[in-house]
A protein has these predicted regions:
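Positively charged, low-complexity/disordered segments
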Residues: 174-178, 182-188
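Proteins enriched for Cys/Gly/acidic motifs involved in redox and nucleic-acid/cofactor modification
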Residues: 1-173, 177-178
Length: 188
């Protein structure tokens, strides 16, 4: 996995943009190079949002565009569309190699290693506390401000909303104050 390059495309909410930054930091810490364009990357990661149906259609169109480049790419679909569609994604588009729910991002490096054994990879478990513990260590502050996730999900189950089903039930970091303090620069 050391010599690989990757590109991340984010759809949807601010949380997805933040999660994409965490994925980028995690993969860079493993020696992978972040590319600005999918054509330059070995691995293309689509971080998806399932709030609007149009996002899923856009995802499949974008995967088609990557396939038209004519180069073999590893394609990972992560986020809420991956959670909602689960293994059905492999049937809808045969070029998808990894399907990863929003609470399993931290497993991506291992899944990439396992993929080298020619097995398509899927993980849509709700293992929220592991993600919080692992990914909080991966982020580097950028500039004078930084995002810190202290809570994710929702437990309200509104009839019109998919968040509890595709993101997770409400989860709050066990020690939000400590998490915020640990992310502050020592000179603050």
């Amino acid at each position: 996995m050391q010599n690989r390059s990757f590109h991340v495309k984010s759809y949807g909410c601010q949380m997805n943009i933040y999660d994409s930054q965490k994925i980028i930091s995690m993969l860079e810490s493993k020696g992978l190079k972040n590319e600005l364009e999918p054509k330059s990357a070995d691995l293309v990661i689509f971080n998806t949002c399932n709030i609007r149906e149009k996002a899923a259609h856009k995802l499949y169109s974008d995967i088609g565009r990557v396939n038209k480049l004519g180069l073999k790419k590893t394609i990972a679909v992560v986020g809420c569309v991956a959670q909602a569609e689960n293994s059905e994604m492999f049937r809808k588009n045969k070029s998808i190699d990894i399907v990863l729910g929003p609470q399993s991002y931290h497993l991506l490096p291992k899944m990439l290693d396992d993929l080298e054994n020619n097995y398509k990879q899927i993980n849509t478990d709700f293992i929220v506390n592991e993600k919080f513990d692992y990914l909080s260590e991966q982020m580097r502050p950028q500039g004078v401000s930084s995002m810190v996730t202290i809570q994710e999900g929702c437990d309200k189950f509104c009839s019109f909303c998919v968040v509890p089903y595709t993101s997770c039930l409400l989860y709050t970091s066990p020690s939000p104050r400590d998490l915020v303090l640990s992310r502050m620069p020592s000179s603050a």
